[in-house]
């Protein structure tokens, strides 16, 4: 059928519906979550009393950061093992057993980056080792193919990991085709020209962020690595003059507009703590959704999405725009009638701009109802995010959100 409303494409889940039914077995252990990621800033943390780098002290720092702010996992990306081909032996600078023990004590799981080729040669042996170590999952990388042999190998990886209680993030992958339905431990796929490329280029435009939900994301979850708060890469990698073409509020919105049950918190922990009031949204936002509503959308121009958290019933809204400043009028008709809600809005400041003033944002909290309509202005390359919960007696003095 042909639908005149572009939002209908966003609601399409045909790839998932046509996929194989879930395999038998207990999947209650599978936990979507946020993951602290060190690759973006190359482990260049500062203000600490140890030498940062690929070592035990640095990764303990990430575990402590994750535990403090409710982040579920940390990722040890490429470089943790003695080589990319020997992924059963950590570098001598890393006491992986101690990291896993420390993470378990703090409630933070450890996920390991792996190259696909050694997995192909010794899949069960490597995954047995990871299970015995206490690793929670793998990010497998550089497959870069979609021939029949590789497609079968994806299935083998997912099955072997499921049997051992490991989550999977397919990086360097082709777009998903429903494998996450068959194996619920498969949480995400790259299969996209994602934000990590901003580390070494400025190719990703605001238009890109407004186009992907209508193209790549229709196929399934997408590991886009959002959450950058400091847009000039030279801040963490001196001499690198790349720039993220987004405002800080836009980066918050991507946690809602870009669907993935596994979402990176990609920036430096110090950057998050510098903008702690904005980071609160990343702390709060859910990743496991009961319902999604596509409120406003025009391919390549803008998109506004509202999603309802599965466990809490709270709503989260995200909106992004292209290189044009625009104002959108938000409906709240998805909320229950007769109830009051408290909404916290994270929006671009009046002088925000993705090129000249990306860190300018405002935060406002107030009451909303099902019949509320709210005008929100987005800067060039900007956006907004909203968290919504039911009001309590303690909120009775709050004014209407404006």
Give, region by region, the residue ranges found by the protein language model.
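Conserved, mostly hydrophobic/aromatic
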Residues: 66, 141, 168, 257, ...
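Solvent-exposed beta-strand/loop surfaces of large extracellular or lumenal domains
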Residues: 141, 345-371
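Acidic/polar loop patches that form or flank catalytic/metal-binding clefts of enzymes
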Residues: 167-172, 263-272, 291-293, 329
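Glycan-recognition and catalytic regions of carbohydrate-active enzymes
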Residues: 270-316, 351-357
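Carbohydrate-binding surface patches
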Residues: 299-342, 384-387
């Amino acid at each position: 059928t042909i639908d005149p409303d572009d939002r209908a494409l966003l609601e399409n889940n045909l790839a998932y519906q046509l996929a194989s039914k879930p395999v038998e077995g207990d999947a209650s252990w599978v936990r979507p979550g946020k993951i602290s990621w060190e690759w973006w800033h190359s482990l260049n943390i500062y203000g600490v009393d140890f030498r940062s780098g690929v070592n035990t002290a640095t990764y303990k720092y990430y575990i402590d950061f994750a535990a403090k702010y409710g982040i579920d996992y940390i990722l040890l990306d490429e470089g943790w093992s003695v080589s990319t081909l020997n992924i059963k032996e950590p570098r001598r600078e890393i006491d992986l057993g101690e990291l896993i023990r420390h993470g378990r004590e703090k409630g933070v799981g450890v996920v390991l980056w792996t190259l696909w080729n050694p997995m192909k040669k010794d899949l069960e042996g490597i995954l047995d080792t990871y299970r015995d170590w206490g690793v929670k999952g793998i990010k497998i990388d550089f497959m870069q193919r979609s021939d029949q042999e590789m497609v079968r190998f994806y299935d083998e990886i997912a099955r072997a990991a499921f049997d051992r209680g490991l989550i999977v993030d397919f990086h360097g992958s082709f777009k998903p085709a429903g494998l996450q339905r068959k194996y619920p431990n498969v949480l995400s796929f790259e299969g996209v020209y994602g934000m990590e490329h901003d580390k070494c280029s400025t190719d990703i435009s605001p238009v890109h962020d407004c186009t992907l939900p209508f193209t790549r994301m229709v196929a399934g979850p997408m590991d886009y690595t959002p959450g950058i708060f400091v847009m000039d890469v030279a801040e963490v990698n001196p001499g690198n003059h790349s720039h993220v073409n987004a405002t800080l509020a836009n980066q918050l919105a991507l946690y809602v507009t870009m669907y993935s049950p596994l979402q990176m918190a990609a920036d430096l922990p110090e950057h998050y703590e510098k903008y702690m009031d904005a980071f609160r949204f990343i702390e709060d936002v859910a990743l496991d959704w009961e319902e999604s509503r596509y409120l406003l959308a025009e391919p390549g121009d803008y998109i506004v999405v509202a999603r309802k958290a599965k466990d809490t019933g709270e709503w989260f809204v995200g909106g992004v725009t292209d290189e044009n400043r625009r104002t959108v009028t938000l409906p709240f008709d998805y909320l229950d009638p007769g109830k009051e809600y408290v909404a916290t809005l994270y929006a671009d400041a009046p002088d925000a701009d993705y090129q000249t003033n990306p860190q300018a944002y405002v935060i406002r909290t107030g009451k909303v109802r099902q019949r509320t309509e709210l005008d929100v202005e987005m800067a060039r390359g900007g956006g907004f995010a909203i968290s919504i919960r039911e009001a309590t007696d303690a909120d009775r003095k709050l004014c209407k959100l404006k």
